[in-house]
From Swiss-Prot:
It comes from Methanosarcina thermophila. This is Methyl-coenzyme M reductase subunit beta. Its EC number is 2.8.4.1. MCR from M.thermophila is a heterotrimer composed of an alpha, a beta, and a gamma subunit. One of its GO terms (cellular component) is cytoplasm. Binds 1 coenzyme F430 non-covalently per MCR heterotrimeric complex. Coenzyme F430 is a yellow nickel porphinoid. Methyl-coenzyme-M reductase is activated when the enzyme-bound coenzyme F430 is reduced, probably to the Ni(I) oxidation state. Optimum pH is 7.0.
Length: 18
């Protein structure tokens, strides 16, 4: 979330998809 915007977005996306 600090310097990993893409990583954070991926985590949220995975949660939303699943």
């Amino acid at each position: 979330s600090d310097t990993v915007d893409i990583y954070d977005a991926g985590k949220i996306l995975e949660r939303v998809i699943i």
